[in-house]
């Protein structure tokens, strides 16, 4: 899920720390991307995507808060979160390192040893939202076609079709779909600020307020994409790179999230992927070949330099006491 390496190894090999799965076939091991049951999507106009740099993400949660505000995501409170009924469209996954040795590989005993916490654990933050998969497992199981794929690479929801079977949430490998157990707005049990005329003014009029019994998820701020495209159309031009930003990418204080059109060769995301495609760029759970629109850049730790600094500080302290 998270891929990382140290600076010394990365300098010698830009793919250090990368996990590249292979699937056994009659023709020998192949990359999952070479094996598929589905025809590819013909994206002629735009292909929206994101690149998230794990080196830059500090886990501050700005993306989460801005997403809540932009997309009218309900604030359900501690009691509902304790029942695993949180409604965030984006979550910050947090992973800790272990002191377990790697000799046991991927055996069950090896994973048991990894449960032992490190004395000084390292942490990785990973923003996780709908990956907008081209081979989306959620789309194939919906009996009413409430979740479909757009011609621009977005996995989209049609709320008035959804009947709440939750098959899509069950089939999502990233677990990023949220079910409305209640009508959260205009409900005295949740978010009191939304129950009066003044409080409702904070709602974004460009985003549908979901009703009870439907699934919702990250839309990649499709309302902003459509507004940007319409503004460009009025001026008889294509959208300029950076003109359209999702709420999460706009609010990120470290610019860890890069959003843009991957079909635009001059866009920041295309330039970044052209450099990192054979380097740090990876997809989460590549082995299941769902072909996400969201890529991550592996985390590179400067362990060697940190160790040298610590040793230098210890030596200086010892010399001072001597």
Protein language model regions, located:
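Non-ligating segments of multi-cofactor redox enzymes
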Residues: 1-322
């Amino acid at each position: 899920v998270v891929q990382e390496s140290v600076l010394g190894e990365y300098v010698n090999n830009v793919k250090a720390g990368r996990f590249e799965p292979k699937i056994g076939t009659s023709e020998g091991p192949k990359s999952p991307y070479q094996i598929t049951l589905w025809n590819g999507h013909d994206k002629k106009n735009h292909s929206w995507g994101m690149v998230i740099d794990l080196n830059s993400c500090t886990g501050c949660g700005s993306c989460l808060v801005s997403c809540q505000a932009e997309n009218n995501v309900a604030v359900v409170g501690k009691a509902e979160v304790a029942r695993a009924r949180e409604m965030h469209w984006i979550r910050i996954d947090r992973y800790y390192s272990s002191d377990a040795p790697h000799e046991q590989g991927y055996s069950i005993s090896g994973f048991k040893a990894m449960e032992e916490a490190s004395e000084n654990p390292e942490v990785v933050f990973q923003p996780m939202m709908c990956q907008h998969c081209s081979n989306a497992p959620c789309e194939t199981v919906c009996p009413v076609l409430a979740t479909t794929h757009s011609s621009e690479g977005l996995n989209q929801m049609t709320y008035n079709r959804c009947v709440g079977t939750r098959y899509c949430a069950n089939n999502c490998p990233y677990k990023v779909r949220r079910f409305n157990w209640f009508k959260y707005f205009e409900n005295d049990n949740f978010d009191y600020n939304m129950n009066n005329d003044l409080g409702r003014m904070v709602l974004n009029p460009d985003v549908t307020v979901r009703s009870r019994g439907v699934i919702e998820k990250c839309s990649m701020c499709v309302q902003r994409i459509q507004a940007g495209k319409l503004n460009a159309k009025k001026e008889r031009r294509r959208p300029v790179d950076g003109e359209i930003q999702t709420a999460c990418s706009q609010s990120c204080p470290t610019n860890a999230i890069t959003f843009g059109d991957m079909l635009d060769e001059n866009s920041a995301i295309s330039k970044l992927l052209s450099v990192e495609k054979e380097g740090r760029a990876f997809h989460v759970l590549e082995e299941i070949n769902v072909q996400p629109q969201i890529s991550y850049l592996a985390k590179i730790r400067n362990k060697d330099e940190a160790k040298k600094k610590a040793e230098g500080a210890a030596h200086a302290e010892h010399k001072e006491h001597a």
